[in-house]
Amino acid sequence: MTKEEINVILKRRIKNGDEFNHLIEKPKNQKVKLQTGDTFYSVSIMSVWAKTFYKQVAKLSQILKGKTIKETCDKIHYFLFYDIQYQADGVTQNIRSPANSWFNRREGIDCKSYSIFASCVLLNLGIKHYIRQIKQPNFNPKQYTHVYVVVPNNQTNGKLEDGYRVIDGTVQSNKEPNYTSKKDVFMSLKLPHIGLNCPVPKKGLKGTPSKTKRSTTTKKSSNQTRGRFPF
């Protein structure tokens, strides 16, 4: 199957999406030439890119947060599928930050960049997940040809034995495709630690972050995007 044939199958009519612009940082017009490598190198760079640029969608992540893991995954998938166009990469593999993906949403991105975007949202929400690359039985079966995100139901230990959810922005159904082989890369942020030997600052002191402003901004954004998700 050619790149053009894949694009015909996976392209969709996307929504306007402008109501999310204020929730996503603008790209800084940076282009970094990375090493040449196989798909394993691609996934390793995807992991680095997500952990480097996840704050670009910190505000959006609060809008995509659901009441459960399932609802959160459904909202992320719905956003990716209906607000960002698909476009297969050629020989050159594009590893996009979420800001770059959003800027190019009408031209399209491929499965790697959908996965980076989903991973960035999940990292902001503190949700453990994996970037999964697979071999598909009916498409170049000897090669790893697709990548997406899986989210374990068990967020305590992050293991997949208790079941998991899939986030695949390339398809409307969001069902995991058949595969003959898989490789998973675990994604979770290491939390910052601060050693203290002083009184805990009281609320209202200079330097203490204001929760009122943040909650007001989040509430305003929620009102603007209300009704965008069918659940």
What feature does the model see in each segment?
Residues 1-231:
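A structural boundary/capping signal
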